Regions:
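Aromatic (tryptophan-biased) beta-strands that constitute blades/sheets of beta-rich domains
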Residues: 1-34, 58, 62-75, 108-115, ...
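A structural signal for beta-strand and strand-to-loop patches characteristic of beta-rich domains
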Residues: 98, 107-108
């Protein structure tokens, strides 16, 4: 499975596709623009539907539990969810600025918090912390235990909202991430201080893009 450096490792593929089962859930909006992955959790699969309900399927494609931790108004926003497992718990971030932790065995809520802006990256974790980027090009570090913020680092903002997820990896004691204008930034994983930053576009190209 994918690691903290977005590396899937070596894969073996024989060129054959075989149907092994069907997983049913309500149709997601804007399916062609979705870049979200199911979570493989203890021989089970965890995914979400268009109202933000989290569904856990067993290896026989049967629903083990289905839980929704959104209000009626939030469900109408069709939140899209990112997952990462941590022991028996699952950490979740979404596209309507919520992030929370649930028990992976029952689906019950451990804690839930709100960010100022929606999230637009996968979740990465390191020891007792996890990391995610929001639409304001801000990398945020939270405690896994209760979701409290350890630190945040805002990089240069843009005038548009990206349809593509920002990249985020962990290398040793660094968190390396990209933002909507193409800057790549490495920060210290404990303090959140910038170690180095690499712009991938000249300022003239960026200005032309938004004029």
């Amino acid at each position: 499975f994918i690691d903290n450096q977005n590396n899937f490792g070596s894969q073996s593929y024989k060129g054959e596709l075989g149907k092994i089962g069907t997983y049913k859930f309500s149709k997601l909006e804007e399916l062609n623009q979705i870049n979200f992955k199911p979570l493989f959790f203890s021989n089970n699969i965890v995914f979400f539907d268009k109202k933000g309900s989290i569904i856990k399927y067993d290896e026989n494609q049967k629903v083990k539990w289905k839980k929704n931790h959104y209000s009626k108004a939030e469900k109408k926003l069709h939140p899209k969810l990112n997952f990462i497992s941590h022991g028996e718990n699952i950490l979740v971030s979404d596209t309507i600025a919520k992030y929370y932790s649930i028990n992976g065995n029952t689906g019950e809520l451990n804690w839930s918090k709100n960010n100022t802006y929606p999230f637009n990256s996968e979740i990465k974790k390191h020891k007792n912390k996890f990391f995610v980027i929001d639409y304001k090009n801000t990398l945020r570090c939270y405690k896994i235990e209760d979701g409290s913020e350890c630190w945040n680092l805002q990089t240069e903002d843009s005038f548009t909202i990206s349809n593509s997820k920002y990249s985020l990896i962990i290398i040793g004691d660094m968190v390396v991430f990209s933002n909507s204008i193409g800057d790549i930034t490495a920060v210290d994983i404990e303090s959140g201080l910038i170690i180095w930053q690499l712009p991938t576009q000249s300022s003239s190209i960026i200005n032309e893009s938004y004029n």
